[in-house]
């Protein structure tokens, strides 16, 4: 089995391993690993500007992402003193497979007044140490995303509606490189629609066509909790909403727009 999601394959290129395999097709990636990889590249582009906080990441999934070599380009659309806007593109097999935008802000300590409504921020239902081990229903003998991450159930149950699941990387996103906090969030956040599914994935497709993550701060530690629910509209559309926590409390939110079809 591979020991990372991606291996560097030259300047601006990464070879995906089988640990990126998703639930819908054995030749396609789960969108979590490439979203994590692009978060890494956006932060690398922002670092020379002194910007380090990934406040927002939006990934528009144009087509299935193959388990193949990926190329990523990042452009600076605007850079100010306190924040910069970036756009990016992910390519594979001579096609653009995803594109998106990101906002990276400058970190600066700020003392807030006591007693603000809604604060202190809420915590996850249970810490990972008190949560039971989880298992994806699409796990199989073939390596895939379910082998890339370890999961623990803090509330509810996987694929049975609203739930809260802790995620921890078993392997790095890029071979030989320590995972960034933003990568830990992105690789987990794309699972919101899966863990909170209310339709049988053997009978229905409910694939997300995008992923937007908004962060108050980076996570601390290895564990990230996704507290998710899935909602469906009347015309083959859906929405997965997630709260994102680390062991200290709420750190952000994520949304996914879903296309729903009978198999």
What are these regions (language model features)?
Residues 1-263:
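Terminal targeting signals and extreme-terminal segments of soluble enzymes
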């Amino acid at each position: 089995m591979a020991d990372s999601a991606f291996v560097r394959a030259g300047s601006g290129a990464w070879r995906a391993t089988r640990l990126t395999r998703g639930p819908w097709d054995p030749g396609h990636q789960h969108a979590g690993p490439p979203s994590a990889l692009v978060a890494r590249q956006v932060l690398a582009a922002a670092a020379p500007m002194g910007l380090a906080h990934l406040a927002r990441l939006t990934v528009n999934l144009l087509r299935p992402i193959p388990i193949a070599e990926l190329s990523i380009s990042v452009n600076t659309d605007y850079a100010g003193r306190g924040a910069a806007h970036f756009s990016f593109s992910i390519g594979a097999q001579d096609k653009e497979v995803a594109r998106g935008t990101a906002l990276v802000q400058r970190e600066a300590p700020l003392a807030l007044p006591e007693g603000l409504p809604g604060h202190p921020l809420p915590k996850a239902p249970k810490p990972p140490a008190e949560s039971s081990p989880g298992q994806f229903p699409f796990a199989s003998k073939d390596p895939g995303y379910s082998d890339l991450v370890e999961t623990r159930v803090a509330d509810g149950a996987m694929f049975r509606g609203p739930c809260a699941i802790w995620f921890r990387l078993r392997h790095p996103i890029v071979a030989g490189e320590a995972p960034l906090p933003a990568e830990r969030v992105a690789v987990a956040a794309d699972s919101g629609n899966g863990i909170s599914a209310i339709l049988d994935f053997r009978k229905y497709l409910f694939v997300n066509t995008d992923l937007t993550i908004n962060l108050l701060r980076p996570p601390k530690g290895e564990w990230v909790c996704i507290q998710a629910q899935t909602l469906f509209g009347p015309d083959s559309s859906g929405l997965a909403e997630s709260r994102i926590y680390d062991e200290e409390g709420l750190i952000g939110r994520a949304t996914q727009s879903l296309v729903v079809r009978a198999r």
